Design a protein with these regions (language model features):
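Alpha-helical cap/lid subdomain in secreted, periplasmic
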Residues: 6-12, 43-68, 72-121
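Catalytic nucleophile-elbow at a beta strand-turn-alpha helix junction centered on a G-D-S/GDSL motif
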Residues: 13-39
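N-terminal post-signal-peptidase region of extra-cytosolic proteins
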Residues: 1-3
């Protein structure tokens, strides 16, 4: 966090990555159409990453804030761990992690896998 604070203090660009599942991606609900399977409703402009970007830009007016959204619908923490390098290669100054919704449907072994993967992330 010291490096991030230094960048903000020195008015250097900051990169924040959001890493998670459909909640991170911007999925807010599932729609049911007659005779069709559930259909996710995405509103990426309302995703929490966008809301936090607005807050950062308001609070840190003289610093450019670059947001990377690495949310993928259906991802579990284990799936996220498998693709973490894709996000880290951009060298974000901060990473906000949000997995768990898809992991919550697992049995006890799946919950242990979630915990292990999240610790590695």
């Amino acid at each position: 966090m010291n490096k991030l604070a230094d960048k903000i203090k020195n008015k250097k660009p900051v990169t924040i990555a959001f890493f998670g599942d459909s909640v991170t991606q911007g999925c807010f609900e599932l729609r049911v159409a007659e005779g069709k399977p559930f259909e996710p409703v995405y509103r990426p402009w309302e995703a929490y990453s966008k809301k936090l970007q607005q807050i950062f830009e308001y609070c840190i007016k003289d610093t450019s804030v670059n947001i990377l959204n690495y949310g993928i619908s259906g991802d579990t923490a284990t799936m996220g761990l498998a693709r973490i390098d894709e996000m880290l290669c951009h060298k974000p100054d901060m990473v906000i992690v949000c997995f768990g919704l898809n992991d919550s449907t697992k049995d006890i072994d799946g919950i242990k896998e979630y915990k292990d993967s999240l610790e590695k992330i």
